[in-house]
Amino acid sequence: MARGLNRVFLIGALATRPDMRYTPAGLAILDLTLAGQDLLLSDNGGEPEVSWYHRVRLLGRQAEMWGDLLDQGQLVFVEGRLEYRQWEREGEKRSELQIRADFLDPLDDRGKKRAEDSRGQPRLRAALNQVFLMGNLTRDPELRYTPQGTAVARLGLAVNERRQGAEERTHFVEVQAWRDLAEWAAELRKGDGLFVIGRLVNDSWTSSSGERRFQTRVEALRLERPTRGPAQACPGRRNRSREVQTGGVDIDEGLEDFPPEEDLPF
């Protein structure tokens, strides 16, 4: 089994004023919405800007410390991890991939450029949106092609994490790869170890029941296959890493909303 690695690094502007609340047990929860624009290199040499909004959660003493000090528009650096949560609501299982902050620090905004969305909320241009994961595939990759012939692969990654004084937890992350990277990933199999470098994106859609649904996933920019573990027993498959310039998707539309508070596991 691949050694678990689960790190998230974000630099963005606070799209709104952070929201502070407490659990019945008295635990402080600070929810922040960071907004930014990633500058990507496309296949044709262009540099499109792709907008993102990520919800970050800070707990405990740090939440109380920063709750009254942060305000809309401030630039913030976040180091944290992805945390998978599952709960049941009205007999239906729900899940969420959350960004849990371990460290937060405001940044000097001199020389930084901002943009505004249609609601006047700030986004940081040339922001930072990076994820590093290592885990094992939970299923064989699913490869398909768009009507334009572009390859896209979906992968499920299980990341094991053991923190000091706590039991081991497994976080389940959906990963998407495009073009040559997708075709390379399609040769992997369930159980293979995989190291992923990518960026966080959000999907939203309407279910068959008319309910709005959301999913946070990782768009892979680089994949590496460790030589140890289950993957080592497959000498006929390519033992190479692959990287791409950009996933080529625009997530600027449809991300104005986030799951309502009653859908969150707190």
From Swiss-Prot:
SUPFAM superfamilies: Nucleic acid-binding proteins (SSF50249). PROSITE patterns: SSB. A motif (Important for interaction with partner proteins) lies at residues 261-266. CDD domains: SSB_OBF (cd04496). One of its GO terms (cellular component) is nucleoid. Residues 250-266 have a biased composition (Acidic residues). GO terms for molecular function: single-stranded DNA binding. Residues 226-266 are annotated as: Disordered. Gene3D superfamilies: Nucleic acid-binding proteins. It holds the Pfam family SSB. Residues 5-108, 128-227 form the SSB domain. Keywords: DNA damage, DNA recombination, DNA repair, DNA replication, DNA-binding, Repeat. GO terms for biological process: DNA recombination; DNA repair; DNA replication. The keyword DNA-binding applies. The keyword Aminoacyl-tRNA synthetase does not apply. InterPro entries: NA-bd_OB-fold, Primosome_PriB/ssb, ssDNA-bd. Plays an important role in DNA replication, recombination and repair. Binds to ssDNA and to an array of partner proteins to recruit them to their sites of action during DNA metabolism. This is Single-stranded DNA-binding protein.
